[in-house]
Amino acid sequence: MENKRFFIVYYSSKSNNTHRFMLKLNCKCLRLPIEQKDEPDEILESKIPTVNHPFILLTPTYAGGLGKLKGAVPKPVKKFLNNPVNRNNCKAVIASGNTNFNDTYCIAGDIISQKLQIPFLYKFELLGTNSDVENVIKIGNEFWEKNNF
């Protein structure tokens, strides 16, 4: 299955797990900048793009289980969504996570979905499987077409 429709904005840390998943999707996308250790907020904010058209956000989850939510949504994703234009153009979210963290598995998707009142389309573990890739393409295309973006 091929993605010919939707656009994804994604964040991937230096581990590149999310980036490797994105390469399998072979779709139009934009990667958010990686936060550098001890980087002042002003520097990170200056690197954050503005996206002037609809997109689906794909984000990893950084939470350690046991209900610990602090830092679940990566800082560059928060900064990106603090921009009203980006927030308005974010139409859905997909999240990755680690099932070892039980109750906080992919919680970044839940947090963003609730805060922005947008659909949480899909969740997958770490690098994702071939089935995850096919599912994201199918679900993303259906969502995009249904909403006429």
Swiss-Prot record:
InterPro entries in UniProt: Flavoprotein-like_sf, RNR_Ib_NrdI_bac, RNR_NrdI
Q: Which domain of life is it from?
A: Bacteria
Against Pfam families, the record matches this protein to: Flavodoxin_NdrI
* Alphabetized GO MF terms: FMN binding
What SUPFAM superfamilies is this protein classified in? Flavoproteins
**Gene Ontology BP annotations:** protein modification process
Which PANTHER family does the UniProt entry name for this protein? PROTEIN NRDI
Family classification: Belongs to the NrdI family.
Function, as annotated, reads: Probably involved in ribonucleotide reductase function.
What's the protein called, per UniProt? Protein NrdI
Organism lineage string = Bacteria, Bacillati, Mycoplasmatota, Mycoplasmoidales, Mycoplasmoidaceae
Query: What gene is this protein a product of?
Result: nrdI
